[in-house]
Amino acid sequence: YCDFAGYTDIAIGCARMMGITLMQNFDRPYIAESIQEFWRRWHISLSSWFKDYIYFPLGGSRCAKWKNYRNIMIVFLVSGLWHGAAWTYVLWGAIHGAYQVIGKLLKVPRQKLLALLHVSEDSRGLHMVRRFNTFVLVCFAWIFFRANSISDLGVLLRKLFTDWHISDAYIKGTFEGMGLTLIGALITILSIFIMNRMDIGKLRLSSGESGCVPVFQY
């Protein structure tokens, strides 16, 4: 995510310096509280293209319920094929499509359960649970995207439940693999937290009486 979002931000910034405004491509997708919200925040330009040229022509959501579910599955299967002609990509797309369909099917039961438990939709704890669940579901689907073949996928899925060897050295090696020390990782996490609290995405550089010209605008 950092690599993908990073170089698109560089492209947006370079274009802005030349007076060209490009659309935002990522909007903190990993704070999404549902898979549907995740796709409103992830790779926005590609998602918009699929919505305009595949989802809407098929009827979008303005059709019978089951046709809408069919449309969602078609869009995500095509999205998987767009990333590569491999069954792992197709499965990745199918999983995300299934996430969305199941989410729609369970919407009313979820609302009834929350009402029964007297849990408010605005509860901070509920927001945290939804973000955690969405993050886990997205990361699980990335396994299918990452696998080089169906056989590799089988190995990766088995390793989720077997041969756990979590140690200090393992955790340290994970951060070092990303080019970070443990302290550097903690500083990065703290910085991201502060940026989200400040909602830095809404900050603007504006020209005023001083004649300053905005260079980057998010």
Locations of regions flagged by a protein language model:
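Membrane-embedded transmembrane alpha-helical bundles that form the catalytic cores
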Residues: 1-191, 196-218
